[in-house]
Amino acid sequence: MLPSATSLLRGPCLGLRAAALRLVRQQVPHVCAVRLMRCSSHRRGEALTGAPLDNAPKEYPPKIQQLVQDIASLTLLEISDLNELLKKTLKIQDVGLMPMGGMVPGAAPAPTAPEAAEEDVPKQKERTHFTVRLTEAKPVDKVKLIKEIKNYVQGINLVQAKKLVESLPQEIKANVAKAEAEKIKAALEAVGGTVVLE
């Protein structure tokens, strides 16, 4: 571009900026920082107290330091007991983990007092796996029971199944899902066996 064209393009922009600055200066009153300091409510000799410096180390009382050392030396079981005792002593309720966004829309409301009392009672964990144990067999139905046991015990022949039935109580199957354990129990009881799920 030519120098004259460049000066023409800059000219109107600079003119608009100057006009805008003049307009702002007319509308905004000038505030003097010194005048603000003189009008403040602080006394002249008093230093302004600011926030404590973040990089300055905080001094803790010896009692607090000793508590921290004692807690740090506890085992996990002792920490669990300490946590439980503190909750009881300070009457703090167990609170589940909150989602990151806070309350989830449509979530269940917080439990009321009767429900909270039910939570204090330890719930028995429902078992999902069982051991099927044959405890008794009717002498009349031994043949049917031996054949049925052969179906459920892997790698066993009729002679081994007969010895198993003659030396009761015996474990038929271990670590079986609840549905399968119930199925085995029903089948063995149908042919004259007495079965216990453990």
From Swiss-Prot:
An example molecular function term from Gene Ontology annotations: mRNA binding
Cross-link (Glycyl lysine isopeptide (Lys-Gly) (interchain with G-Cter in ubiquitin)): K150
Biased composition, class Low complexity, residue ranges: 106-115
Pfam family, one: Ribosomal_L12
This protein's UniProt keywords: Acetylation, Isopeptide bond, Mitochondrion, Ribonucleoprotein, Ribosomal protein, Transit peptide, Ubl conjugation
Subcellular localization(s) per the UniProt record: Mitochondrion matrix
Disordered: annotated span: 106-126
Record-level GO BP terms: mitochondrial transcription; positive regulation of DNA-templated transcription; translation
N6-acetyllysine PTM positions: K125, K138, K142, K144, K150, K163, K173, K178, K185
Record PTM: Two mature forms are produced by differential two-step proteolytic cleavage. Cleaved by the mitochondrial processing protease to produce the long mature form and subsequently by the mitochondrial intermediate protease to produce the short mature form. In the presence of CUL3, undergoes 'Lys-63'-linked ubiquitination at Lys-150 which results in proteasomal degradation.
Residues annotated as transit peptide in the record: 1-36
Modification type N6-succinyllysine: residues: K150, K162, K178
Keyword presence, Cell cycle: no
CC annotations in GO: mitochondrial inner membrane; mitochondrial large ribosomal subunit; mitochondrial matrix
Keyword check for Ribosomal protein: yes
Domain of life: Eukaryota
Family affiliation: Belongs to the bacterial ribosomal protein bL12 family.
Assembly, per entry: Component of the mitochondrial ribosome large subunit (39S) which comprises a 16S rRNA and about 50 distinct proteins. Interacts with NOA1.
Free-text function comment from the UniProt entry: As a component of the mitochondrial large ribosomal subunit, plays a role in mitochondrial translation. When present in mitochondria as a free protein not associated with the ribosome, associates with mitochondrial RNA polymerase POLRMT to activate transcription. Required for POLRMT stability.
Protein name: Large ribosomal subunit protein bL12m
Gene responsible for this protein: MRPL12
